[in-house]
Amino acid sequence: MLFKSFALTLLFAAARVQAASNCSSGPYNISAQGTLDELNSCTVLNGDLYISDAGNSGITTLTVNGIESVQGDVVVSDGQYLTSLSFPSLKNVSGAFNVNNMIRMNNLATPELTSVGSLNLAVLPNLQELQFNAGLSDSDSVVIDDTQLQAIDGISLDSVTTFQVTNNRYIQEITMEGLESAQNIQISANSKGVSVNFSKLSNVTTATFDGISNVFIGNLKSAAGNLYFSNTTLDNISVPYLTEIGQSFAVLYSPELTSLNFPNLTTVGGGFVINDTGLTSIDGFPVISEIGGGLVLLGNFSSIDMPDLSDVKGALTVETKATNFTCPWSNDDSVIKGDDFTCQGSVATISATSSYDLSSTVSATSGSATSATGSATTTSYSSDSSASSSSSSSHESSAASNGFTAGALVLGSLLVAALAM
């Protein structure tokens, strides 16, 4: 009897040693529930966890039991049949949490997950709901691309490097009420009626808002890079506390827009572009004094009111269809420093030529000649919003997995389109 008890003790100890070994010998490649079950005793998994169905096993449901922490990446990809994946105990992932190319997945349960190194959800065309029940409060990057989500629920961050929501055709609301600081924000190619709320956002590097119906960034004070609005159904854009934009500013193809309100904006380090047919007056910038690149204003406006503007380092292109327009600047004054000067009304078709290429604009402080004179590129302009099409990034997961790289391509295409029409 004593020997039997001793043998059982040894067996139990051996099992614990084996379990500990299983938990620290990653990476782990999983394609079946049985393989996952071998990790049930692991509370902490050391190494990357890869879950895929590349072998077309036909498995439809997987549950990752027991694991509370992964010291590495979690990558779930390329499953043709997997519809449901559950991490009932998972609380944190030190690396990336990536789920992509799962065309049938309609359930992704992560009820305890609060912290990841980065979050990437891409090409999940049947995923309708996020289940971050405990609240995802820590992630350096969030990329959500090509899903059927209607809202971004359960994500509450106060700072983030990249926040990208693209190609989600059913999404109606993107709300990040606690977000105060971000390096790169890209909202584009989603549902036409999407509403965006970043009510506490005070600092951003670059932000693109494309195809939105409502936006609240009323507390934004600093934009160190670019700030773009395009293809929107907004009737008003108001950013009352913003004082400086480090690089370029653009408002494009938003025909319902009737007013702009930037009462404290003094400086734009790069190009300044407005191409909209709904504005009857270019105003709302009462204290802007310096534009580090070119100034491009296209549309149906009858007046321009920028009373403090004294220094435009690049070229000027102003064209409007209004017949009662009077240009507030002349080629002889000292405001426009660039070589090209176009400022005219009664234009039947907005189609001018300029040597200024906004896509090459950089901050005036960089010392580049581009910011002062523009590049030697011939471009033309059009104020017809119908000529523009919304820039949509690829539905391939590679675009989303590259984070803001895809966003940069979208921004570039928008700017090139604005200047090439």
Curated annotation (Swiss-Prot):
It is found in: Cell membrane; Secreted, Cell wall. Residues 365-394 are annotated as: Disordered. One of its GO terms (biological process) is intracellular signal transduction. GO terms for cellular component: cell surface; external side of plasma membrane; extracellular region; fungal-type cell wall. The GPI-anchor is attached to the protein in the endoplasmic reticulum and serves to target the protein to the cell surface. There, the glucosamine-inositol phospholipid moiety is cleaved off and the GPI-modified mannoprotein is covalently attached via its lipidless GPI glycan remnant to the 1,6-beta-glucan of the outer cell wall layer. Extensively N-glycosylated. A lipid is attached at residue 398 (GPI-anchor amidated serine). It comes from the Eukaryota. Keywords: Cell membrane, Cell wall, Cell wall biogenesis/degradation, Glycoprotein, GPI-anchor, Lipoprotein, Membrane, Secreted, Signal, Transmembrane, Transmembrane helix. Induction: Expression is under the control of atf1 and mbx1 via the putative cAMP-responsive element (CRE) sequence TTACAGTAA and the RLM1-binding sequence GTATATATAG in the promoter region. It is a lipid-anchor; GPI-anchor. Residues 1-19 form the signal peptide. Involved in the negative feedback regulation of pmk1 cell integrity signaling and is linked to cellular calcium signaling. This is Cell wall protein ecm33.
